[in-house]
Amino acid sequence: METVLVLCSLLAPVVLASAAEKEKEKDPFYYDYQTLRIGGLVFAVVLFSVGILLILSRRCKCSFNQKPRAPGDEEAQVENLITTNAAEPQKAEN
């Protein structure tokens, strides 16, 4: 009798584990919302920081005694190129 009781007690975790696996199989779309939220916030902070660094590196050269930019800098050259391309008449293709 004792051996039957020992065998049944050894089989109980197996039966419970298989029941837990069946329960997990019923819900295939389980999301860990806490991890998803933290990952999204970390991703947003990284993108925000990269954006701020790009803006500051483009505009500020970290020097207070720096001369103002000359009118012939690269941004002005790009604007002039755009306006000259827009002013040229487009040729009709026949």
Swiss-Prot record:
Residues 1-17 form the signal peptide. One of its GO terms (cellular component) is glutamatergic synapse. Residues 58-94 are cytoplasmic. The chain crosses the membrane at residues 35-57. It comes from the Eukaryota. It is found in: Cell membrane. GO terms for biological process: potassium ion transport; regulation of monoatomic ion transport; sodium ion transport. Residues 18-34 are extracellular. InterPro entries: FXYD_motif (IPR047297), Ion-transport_regulator_FXYD (IPR000272). It is a single-pass type I membrane protein. The keyword Glycosyltransferase does not apply. Associates with and regulates the activity of the sodium/potassium-transporting ATPase (NKA) which catalyzes the hydrolysis of ATP coupled with the exchange of Na(+) and K(+) ions across the plasma membrane. Reduces the apparent affinity for intracellular Na(+) with no change in the apparent affinity for extracellular K(+). In addition to modulating NKA kinetics, may also function as a regulator of NKA localization to the plasma membrane. This is FXYD domain-containing ion transport regulator 6. It comes from Mus musculus. The gene is Fxyd6.
